[in-house]
């Protein structure tokens, strides 16, 4: 396997699960999404790169998921190491970056970066969890159309039934209509961690604690199988942060998400054409 060397980092593509998992476990709560992808159903489409210091110790990791749109790009560890990986090993053209502000600064010469969206990574374990009771019901593949209608994803861009079959989703119905739901982004029982996501309540039915009910139900079921549950929430969404805190979630770290476009090559010159052809993408609710 080809290895690139710079004055500060030695980088290479990696596929050994134990090597990847060992590094991710150094901050497993920050790496919750990546740990989910490590053994997830889409793992064949996930590429990994790592950087090492002069002694051969790993210093940074980058994960690129080719199976989603936009393609997630997760950065962890030394910013200069992440930059070296993206310069020599993993070179996605367009991606949705998740990392820290320092990571963004380190790769700014390689990628054109959109304005950052600041997120809080909140986490809970069994000891801290404070469940919130309510009429939340487990959703199944039979509820796929109702869930897509709530998320307004439509039939072309909506979730397939497998999302509800493989994940854990709960919802609240009012007079038969699904008005609130929450589910999972990733579950890794082997690593003992899961990620809650896609929390949404219809605008006409907010103010009734429905989001807290469905999030509580999903979290409770997850904690029966894993030690830690994580989620992301917009840092400026104070009501949501407070609601999750009442369930026992605490803030583990702050991170940023943003679209990133490779600067080099003809791809960048084609940006106006790509933008004109781009299918609108609605960010998942958080």
Where are these regions (language model features)?
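Conserved donor-binding loop and adjoining core beta-sheet/short helix segment
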Residues: 2, 6-11, 22-88, 182-197
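Short amphipathic alpha-helix that is part of the acyltransferase structural core
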Residues: 2-33, 119-121, 125-158, 272-286
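Acyl-donor-binding surface of acyltransferase catalytic domains
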Residues: 48, 54-133, 258
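A conserved beta-strand-loop-helix scaffold within acyl/acetyltransferase catalytic domains
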Residues: 65, 158-200
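Conserved acetyl-CoA-binding loop-helix of GNAT-fold acetyltransferases
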Residues: 79-89, 201, 207-223, 241-246
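Conserved active-site alpha-helix within GNAT-family acetyltransferase domains
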Residues: 102-115, 212, 235-253
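…primarily DNA-binding HTH/wHTH and HhH modules…
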Residues: 240-242, 246-286
């Amino acid at each position: 396997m080809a290895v690139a060397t710079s004055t500060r980092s030695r980088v290479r593509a990696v596929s050994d699960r134990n090597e990847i998992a060992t590094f991710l476990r150094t901050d497993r709560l920050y790496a919750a999404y990546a740990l989910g992808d490590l053994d997830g159903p889409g793992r064949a489409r996930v590429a990994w790169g790592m950087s090492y210091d002069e002694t051969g110790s790993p210093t940074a990791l980058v994960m690129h998921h080719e199976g989603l749109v936009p393609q997630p790009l997760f950065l962890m560890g030394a910013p200069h190491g992440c930059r070296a990986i993206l310069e020599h090993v993993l070179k996605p053209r367009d991606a949705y970056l998740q990392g820290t502000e320092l990571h963004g600064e380190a790769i700014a010469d390689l990628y054109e970066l959109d304005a950052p969206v600041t997120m809080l990574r909140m986490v809970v374990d069994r000891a801290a969890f404070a469940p919130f009771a309510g009429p939340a019901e487990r959703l199944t593949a039979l509820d796929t159309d109702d869930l897509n209608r709530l998320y307004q994803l439509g039939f072309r861009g909506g979730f397939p039934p497998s999302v509800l079959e493989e994940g854990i989703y709960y919802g609240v119905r009012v007079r038969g209509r699904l008005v609130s739901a929450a589910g999972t982004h990733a579950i890794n029982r082997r690593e003992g961690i899961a990620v809650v996501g896609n929390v949404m309540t219809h605008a006409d039915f907010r103010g009734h604690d429905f989001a807290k009910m469905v999030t509580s139900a999903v979290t409770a079921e997850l904690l029966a199988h894993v030690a830690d549950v994580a989620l992301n929430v917009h840092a400026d969404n104070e009501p949501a942060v407070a609601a999750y805190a009442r369930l026992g979630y605490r803030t583990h770290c702050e991170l940023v998400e943003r679209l990133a476009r490779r600067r080099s090559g003809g791809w960048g010159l084609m940006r106006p054409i790509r933008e004109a052809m781009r299918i609108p993408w609605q960010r998942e609710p958080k």
